[in-house]
């Protein structure tokens, strides 16, 4: 191909329309991103973006007059198309018109106002209410890796420094939506998760320290709990903030201060164990009611649903912290009426956390602000129900715990109030000022869109009331004018009408054309009628249409002020949302405990694990009309290995799983399905259940089994709970028995 001359290139550039030139400039700044370019009432896409969008969205691919490929979607319907592109794993940059086209001189000014990715979404209704949407950044290498996670929809910001071997487990705990890593790093990325690479310098801890301090207006990070050993996590946080700032140029005012998490505070549950125990996802895709989360989730708010999922995926290891939660659950179990009052009060609370985040970001619609108002107005009922529960005391035991010995710590104190409920009562902000402002300002049922009008309540603003009176009075004026003109002209069919093109007009049929007064000015000719205007009608039109335009502007100003008030109070709203989430989880766990006849476990730092008449919570609930046979399990410091034998379909795998599920429930702060439970804190939980191959990676059933078993043997410690089902069945009987024997011996002796 012959080289293109400079003159030819200049000529081609000169022939390119100014709008397309600007599109190219913006596109160059956002490579590997589909650009939604606002043109009037459409978002248009050009060149390769148009071709890709046409395939994914199944929309028409056309071209401009100059042959440039073109596809577009209406602005009003753009949200659904945008959601489809994000679900397909694409990034989309939204380039909006940032000035009124009527006032523009030349090309309308446009800017990218947001880049939407699977890990950075603020759009209404896109995310599952009961699940976080974390964008995660990883930094560092052996032996320590830093992790930073931000859920843009809720404002949560987490930091964690962990061993390189624990990265996959930590990512599984979060349930991330996308990941950011240095371009030269060999860090793990879960399958199906969008991966973004950044320059190594962006992960520098010193730069990150400055970035975090500047963003949250603090002089030092000491108050955040960031220590010298958290440099890797800090580096990840800096890169993550820088990346999100590019995606959200308008800012992230709802972003909370980072919370430092310590990996040794949580029970290690790897991906294999989460899958085998079906904690949050079923083994069979699409199966319903098969997970532990579905079994225990009786929450009534989206915030509570998300927190319950977090607790289930991150059980605790500190007996005192576990008892703190269990005390609250026990009070709610014992006070059934108080529990139901609390749940009824919470039932009308919407997703305050995400709605407030959208308000702070200037994205909340009138209907969403109305949902916040309705939620805030329920807070006094929540507070009253909480105060009654917090006043309840835990019962004083009449005898020592059956499994208690002098070498074991005592169970939590009784005859006292639950500290968790008292703390929640102290922290709950009724947000009375916001509730009052929103109740006075918003209509009872605000519309979905501000442009629809009818957002602000009458009597809230005198200027708006005057403009509305002028508009509403116009209806009477039109009726009066029509009657007067009929009498003056003697034309009984004369009528006053309006359309967006010609404005107000007087319409007269051709049969009465001879009676048209001389002061009527013809405006439009129809097949059977003529349309006219008069000086009086022109003057009225100018006044009314001007009033409607000013009314829309004023209503937008007032709504913006109400939304900004929520944004300014975002920290208070987020604190209250966190309290509501905890209350919802405690009440839900209590409700499930009562319905399932669960008992409070005694959680301690010994090595005993005793379960009397334990049941599998999921299976028991699924076979509600059948009798589930309970089973005992007992492990002590002296007897730490148990072999379960029996015929096929006798329930051996069920017993293994129910032991694991009872431990998870106990350490997350829930009652457990048993007659009695004593749980010595477990630091790591491993399971090897079932047989499967991994042909995509060239691994047979036996290879997968041995790889998983090897990982367990390398990572299990003195406080680990290991549940192995039929080790060695992927090979011959003789070899399988030898493998099972060797593995059992190793676990027993270590």
Label for each model-derived stretch:
Residues 95, 118-127, 251, 479-491, ...:
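Active-site phosphate-binding and catalytic loops of NTP-dependent enzymes
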Residues 47-50, 300, 311, 509-541, ...:
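ATPase nucleotide-binding head domains, primarily ABC-like/P-loop NTPase cores
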Residues 315, 335-338, 365, 453-456, ...:
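Amphipathic alpha-helical coiled-coil segments and their boundaries
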Residues 361, 365, 378, 420-423, ...:
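Charged, surface-exposed helical/loop "interaction arms" that form contiguous linear patches used
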Residues 443-447, 526, 530-564, 580:
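Extended, charged coiled-coil "arm/hinge" scaffolds of SMC/Rad50-like chromosome-maintenance ATPases
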Residues 2-334, 340, 344-360, 364-394, ...:
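Charged catalytic and DNA/RNA-contacting regions of genome-maintenance
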Residues 391-417:
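Intrinsic disorder/low-complexity segments
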């Amino acid at each position: 191909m012959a080289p293109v001359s400079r003159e030819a290139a200049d000529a081609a550039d000169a022939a390119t329309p100014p709008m397309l030139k600007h599109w190219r400039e913006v596109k160059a700044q956002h490579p590997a991103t589909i650009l939604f370019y606002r043109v009037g009432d459409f978002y248009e896409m050009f060149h390769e973006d148009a071709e890709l969008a046409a395939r994914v969205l199944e929309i028409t691919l056309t071209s401009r007059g100059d042959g440039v490929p073109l596809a577009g979607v209406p602005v009003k319907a753009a949200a659904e198309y945008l959601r489809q592109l994000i679900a397909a794993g694409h990034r989309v940059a939204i380039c909006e018109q940032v000035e009124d086209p009527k006032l523009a001189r030349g090309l309308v000014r446009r800017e990218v106002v947001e880049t939407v990715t699977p890990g950075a979404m603020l759009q209404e209704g896109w995310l599952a209410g009961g699940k976080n949407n974390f964008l995660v950044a990883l930094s560092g290498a052996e032996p320590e890796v830093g992790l930073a996670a931000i859920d843009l929809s809720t404002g949560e910001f987490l930091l964690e420094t962990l061993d390189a071997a624990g990265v996959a487990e930590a990512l599984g705990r979060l349930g991330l939506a996308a990941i950011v890593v240095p371009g030269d790093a060999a860090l793990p990325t879960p399958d199906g998760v969008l991966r973004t690479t950044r320059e190594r310098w962006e992960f520098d801890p010193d730069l990150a320290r400055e970035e975090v301090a500047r963003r949250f207006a603090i002089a030092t990070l000491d108050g955040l709990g960031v220590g010298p050993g958290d440099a890797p996590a800090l580096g990840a946080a800096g890169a993550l903030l820088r990346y999100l700032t590019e995606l959200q140029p308008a800012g992230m005012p709802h972003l909370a201060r980072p919370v430092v998490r310590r990996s040794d505070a949580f029970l290690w549950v790897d991906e294999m164990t989460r899958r085998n125990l079906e904690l949050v996802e079923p083994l069979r895709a699409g199966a319903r009611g098969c997970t532990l989360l579905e079994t225990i989730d009786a929450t009534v708010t989206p915030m509570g649903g998300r927190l319950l999922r977090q607790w289930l995926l991150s059980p605790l290891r500190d007996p005192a912290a576990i008892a703190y939660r269990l005390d609250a659950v026990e009070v709610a179990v014992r006070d059934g009426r108080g529990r139901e009052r609390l749940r009824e009060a919470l039932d009308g609370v919407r997703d305050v956390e995400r709605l407030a985040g959208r308000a702070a970001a200037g994205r909340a619609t009138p209907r969403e602000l109305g949902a916040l108002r309705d939620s805030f107005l329920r807070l006094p009922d929540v507070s009253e129900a909480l105060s009654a529960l917090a006043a309840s005391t835990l019962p004083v035991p009449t005898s020592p715990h059956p499994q208690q010995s002098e070498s074991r710590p005592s169970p939590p104190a009784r005859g006292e109030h639950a500290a968790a409920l008292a703390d929640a009562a102290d922290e709950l902000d009724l947000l009375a000022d916001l509730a009052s402002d929103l109740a006075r300002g918003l209509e009872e049922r605000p519309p979905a869109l501000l442009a629809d009008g009818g957002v602000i309540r009458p009597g809230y603003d005198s200027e708006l009331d005057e403009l509305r009176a002028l508009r509403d009075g116009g209806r009477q004026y039109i009726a009066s004018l029509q009657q007067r003109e009929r009498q003056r002209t003697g034309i009984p069919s004369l009528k006053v009408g309006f359309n967006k093109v010609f404005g107000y007009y007087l319409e007269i049929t051709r049969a009465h054309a001879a009676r048209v007064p001389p002061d009527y000015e013809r405006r439009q000719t129809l097949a059977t009628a003529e349309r006219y205007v008069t000086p009086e009608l022109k003057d009225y039109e100018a006044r009314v249409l001007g009033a409607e335009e000013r009314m829309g502007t004023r209503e937008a100003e007032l709504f913006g002020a109400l939304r900004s008030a929520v944004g300014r109070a975002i920290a208070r709203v987020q604190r209250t949302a966190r309290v509501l989430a905890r209350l919802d989880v405690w009440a839900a766990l209590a409700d499930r405990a009562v319905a399932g006849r669960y008992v409070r476990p005694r959680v301690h730092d010994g090595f005993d694990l005793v379960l009397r008449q334990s049941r599998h919570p999921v299976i028991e609930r699924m076979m509600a009309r059948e009798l589930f046979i309970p089973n005992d399990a007992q492990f002590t410091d002296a007897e730490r290995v148990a072999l379960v034998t029996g015929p096929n379909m006798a329930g051996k795998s069920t017993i293994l799983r129910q032991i694991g599920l009872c431990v998870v429930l106990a350490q997350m702060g829930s009652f457990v399905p048993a007659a009695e439970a004593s749980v010595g804190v477990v630091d790591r939980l491993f399971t090897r259940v079932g047989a499967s191959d991994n042909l995509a990676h060239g691994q047979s059933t036996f290879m997968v089994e041995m790889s998983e078993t090897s990982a367990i043997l390398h990572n299990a410690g003195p406080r680990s709970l290991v549940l192995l089902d039929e080790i060695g069945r992927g090979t011959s009987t003789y070899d399988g028995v030898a493998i099972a024997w060797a593995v059992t011996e190793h676990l027993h002796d270590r």
